[in-house]
């Protein structure tokens, strides 16, 4: 099938080009993309790939157009959110933790299917595709059926970030930290992931403190009901739980210092490979330091839960989103990086 895809080559401007997508295999689905979120992981991967041509994008939402012969539970015409790929067979997948799938790297970051075959060709030449099992910076994407979560009539530009960014922030709160009424959560960094965590915690009746240098993001967090400060160096109350979205070692240590005894810090920001942590303090105060990928979520369960909260007015994720045309990718990157927008979502031109 022909599709328009956003082809990236390192730091060079991205370009919309025509590509050929494979026909769906028995376990695959062809989805017409209606919206796709822009995530920091897309930009980090583009940088890591250097000049290798790639079709990225991993927060897609769209309509099922074709089904592989072995797909059950989906119908042509279903609107679906596309989340990360997982095998569905390993111990982690079977125990409800697909983000830690044994094949996670192969299925999400190899640029091809698990068997090594490509899914996207430009001018007959295979390019890096199957990113997070989808490569949805495009008008259409070929995905594994396990990655598709039906979402009904939710606006696609709101639903798309539920595939990764909003899923990560919300899941970190609901699945990993699990604070409740009477607890106080510190969120370090109020970008898309952090803001989704803020809204989710507030919907649980949790008191929330936010450290965020960008004034517009602080103002938004304050309007939602959080206490927002520019820096962790500001006077802050102690907290029962903390979530770091930055991965910066100095902020990790400051967040740990603000935890009450037996408190928990979850880390979702990917920073340097190493960091110095005061292990004795962790031991003596009974602190926990938790890693967290994709909110440790089962998308098929958490995405509908979050949509339900949105529909009831408990989770106004739509207020975090700014839309752009797919061809405006480079402008969206700049404006999101500069803090002019919180969550950029790209809409493929019809």
Give the location of each predicted region:
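A short acidic, Gly/Pro-enriched loop at the edge of an enzyme's catalytic core
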Residues: 27, 234-242
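C-terminal hydrophobic helical "lid"/dimerization subdomain
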Residues: 3, 300-350
């Amino acid at each position: 099938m022909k599709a328009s895809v956003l082809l990236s080559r390192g730091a060079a401007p991205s370009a919309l080009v025509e590509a050929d997508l494979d026909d769906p295999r028995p376990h695959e689905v062809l989805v017409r993309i209606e919206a796709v979120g822009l995530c920091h992981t897309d930009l980090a991967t583009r940088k890591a790939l250097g000049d290798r041509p790639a079709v990225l994008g991993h927060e897609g939402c769209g309509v099922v157009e074709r089904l592989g012969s072995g797909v059950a539970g989906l119908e042509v015409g279903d609107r679906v959110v596309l989340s990360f790929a997982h095998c569905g067979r390993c111990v982690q997948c079977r125990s409800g933790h697909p983000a830690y799938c044994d094949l996670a790297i192969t299925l999400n970051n190899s640029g091809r299917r698990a068997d090594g075959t490509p899914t996207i060709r430009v001018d007959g030449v295979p390019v890096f595709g199957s990113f997070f099992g989808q490569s949805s910076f495009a008008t259409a994407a070929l995905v594994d059926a396990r990655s598709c979560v039906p979402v009904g009539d939710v606006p696609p530009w709101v639903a798309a970030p539920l595939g990764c960014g909003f899923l990560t922030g919300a899941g970190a709160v609901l699945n990993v930290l699990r604070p409740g009424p009477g607890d106080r959560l510190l969120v370090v960094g109020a970008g898309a992931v952090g803001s989704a965590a803020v809204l989710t915690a507030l919907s649980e009746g949790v008191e929330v403190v936010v450290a965020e240098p960008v004034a517009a993001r602080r103002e938004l967090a304050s309007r939602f009901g959080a206490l927002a400060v520019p820096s962790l160096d500001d006077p802050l109350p102690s907290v029962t739980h903390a979530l770091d979205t930055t991965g910066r070692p100095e902020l990790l240590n400051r967040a740990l210092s603000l935890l009450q005894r037996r408190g928990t810090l979850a880390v979702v920001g990917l920073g340097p490979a190493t960091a110095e942590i005061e292990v004795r303090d962790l031991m003596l105060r009974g602190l926990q330091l938790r890693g967290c990928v994709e909110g440790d979520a089962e998308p098929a369960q958490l995405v509908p839960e979050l949509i339900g909260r949105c529909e009831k007015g408990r989770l106004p994720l739509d207020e975090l989103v700014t839309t752009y045309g797919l061809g405006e990718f480079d402008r969206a990157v700049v404006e999101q990086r500069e803090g002019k927008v919180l969550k950029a979502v790209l809409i493929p031109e019809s």
